[in-house]
């Protein structure tokens, strides 16, 4: 068997998430159907680096799969790109060593979250940015977001009921900038892994801080007390993008 690594992007609006699930459309299922056709009807299973939720987009998701024979990477990329649905794009396909695993090889992820702060909102971006129509102070957001950097127990920012026991993660970069052309806020988070709904909960909290309904110090309190009820609401999935995955050499 020959192992291939692919980088893909997708519009998450019409997907119930990346991972295959019964009675719902998933990115995994669409790609596996195409690979099975290419593989003369023999089933092919893909393994993604991250499992994005329903409505979440990807600019640089990574996956791997095995095929019984060696193929030209660009020809395989072109075949997958043209035979998968229009809301999936294959950016690159390359042959990798048999021990490469998209999920378990050590890597870091970068996510972006787009918030439309226009009044009125941009209706063309309703599936691709979360609208926030209330006043915001960028300086408060900038002060608060840096407190998320470093190694912390992010229990207070994860969804209740998650099965993951170790909730300690390292965020290497957390920043926000204002995109004047689109009237958007762009949040960027990089780290060694993120918990279920962690980024959306962090953004929801930061927006309340920017709106002066929570103090800047609330971030430290949530981290210290590990209490989800102290954090803000969960921001919508439509603003979240898996931007990039970087593997250690």
UniProtKB/Swiss-Prot annotation:
The active site is at 53 (nucleophile). One of its GO terms (biological process) is tRNA pseudouridine synthesis. Pfam families: PseudoU_synth_1. Its EC number is 5.4.99.12. GO terms for molecular function: RNA binding; tRNA pseudouridine(38-40) synthase activity. Substrate binds at residue 111. Gene3D superfamilies: Pseudouridine synthase I, catalytic domain, C-terminal subdomain, Pseudouridine synthase I, catalytic domain, N-terminal subdomain. It catalyses: uridine(38/39/40) in tRNA = pseudouridine(38/39/40) in tRNA. Keywords: Isomerase, tRNA processing. It is an enzyme of class 5 (isomerase). The keyword Isomerase applies. NCBIfam families: hisT_truA (TIGR00071). Belongs to the tRNA pseudouridine synthase TruA family. Homodimer. This is tRNA pseudouridine synthase A.
């Amino acid at each position: 068997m020959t192992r291939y690594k692919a980088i893909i992007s997708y519009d998450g609006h019409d997907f119930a998430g990346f991972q295959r699930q019964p009675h719902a459309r998933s990115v995994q299922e669409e790609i596996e159907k195409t690979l099975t056709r290419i593989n003369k009807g023999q089933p092919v299973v893909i393994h993604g680096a991250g499992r994005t939720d329903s409505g979440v987009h990807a600019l640089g998701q990574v996956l791997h799969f095995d095929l019984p024979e060696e193929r030209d990477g660009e020809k395989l990329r072109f075949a997958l790109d043209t035979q998968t649905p229009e809301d999936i794009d294959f950016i690159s396909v390359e042959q990798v060593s048999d021990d490469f695993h998209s999920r378990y090889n050590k890597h870091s992820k970068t996510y972006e979250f787009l918030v439309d702060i226009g009044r009125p909102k941009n209706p063309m971006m309703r599936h691709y940015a979360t609208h926030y129509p209330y006043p915001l102070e960028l300086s408060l957001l900038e002060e608060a977001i840096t407190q998320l950097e470093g190694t912390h127990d992010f229990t207070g920012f994860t969804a209740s009921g998650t099965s993951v026991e170790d909730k300690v993660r390292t965020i290497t970069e957390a920043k926000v900038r204002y995109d004047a052309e689109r009237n958007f806020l762009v949040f960027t988070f990089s780290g060694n892994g993120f918990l279920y709904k962690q980024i959306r909960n962090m953004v929801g909290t930061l927006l309340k801080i920017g709106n002066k309904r929570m103090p800047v110090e609330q971030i430290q309190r949530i981290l210290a007390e590990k209490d989800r009820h102290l954090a803000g609401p969960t921001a919508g999935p439509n603003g979240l993008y898996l931007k990039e995955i970087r593997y250690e050499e």
